[in-house]
Amino acid sequence: KKSFARISGFEYFQLIRSEKIDQQGKDKIAVIVARGTIVDGVQPPGTIGGDSTSRLIREAHEDENVKAIVLRVDSGGGGVFASEQIRQELLEAKEKGLKIIASMGNVAASGGYWISANAHEIWASHNTITGSIGIFGLLPTFDRALNEIGINSDGVKTSKIDLSGDITQPLSEGLSKIIQSEIEYGYKRFIGLVSEARDIPIDQVDQIAQGRVWAGSSAKDLGLVDEIGNPVSYTHLRAHETVH
């Protein structure tokens, strides 16, 4: 049987992902694609890893020939920690004087907006879905499902406050209050960073946040987006303006 040369898709994309920015030439623009769910750690293409995406941004701002970063965002969000990790790396690039341009794809919502908010310019298309400025948390419990098949559990503890998060039991009132307070804190932090980054009063941000999603054109009217246009060609043109 005839065969052909081949390589696994995972190995191929890992090779591309790990390729460093060309060290030759000056006045370069680094284009970094952030596509997929935002999660912690090092992730393959198709998922935005807090460590791996931050590393790409770091490689860009540590290259003295790179003058601008275009962050191409196509993400519905993900984890707060990873999103903040990426945002902090972009802030480091800004501190070094690099121009940061966020180019939104089909979706740049929730965590996708979190990592875009501090860009010098945010570009989107008319139909980009963005916003979703909000925080939520989930804790699965299986007490009802287990009860249906006749499996029950019980136990003893030294406190009335149950913080164990036992998935075989209903969510306790104490743990529920703690989770709710963390969600509320995260939400205030989110609208606070958007308010500061976009220079919008925090009360106004709260009105347009609360998990609402907006089309790109509406987001521009609300001040969440700077420009509407081709999110690739126009963004590159504006990035070139900062270099030459």
Language model regions located:
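Small-residue-centered hinge/linker elements
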Residues: 1-100, 107-197, 238
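Single conserved hydrophobic/aromatic residue that forms the stacking wall/gate
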Residues: 236-244
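Generic long, charged, amphipathic alpha-helical segments
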Residues: 206-208
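Active/binding-pocket-proximal capping segment
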Residues: 76, 210-214, 234
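Short acidic-hydrophobic, aromatic-tinged amphipathic segments that line or gate anion-handling sites
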Residues: 124, 225-230
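Tryptophan-centric aromatic hotspots in well-structured domains and transmembrane helices
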Residues: 114, 214-215
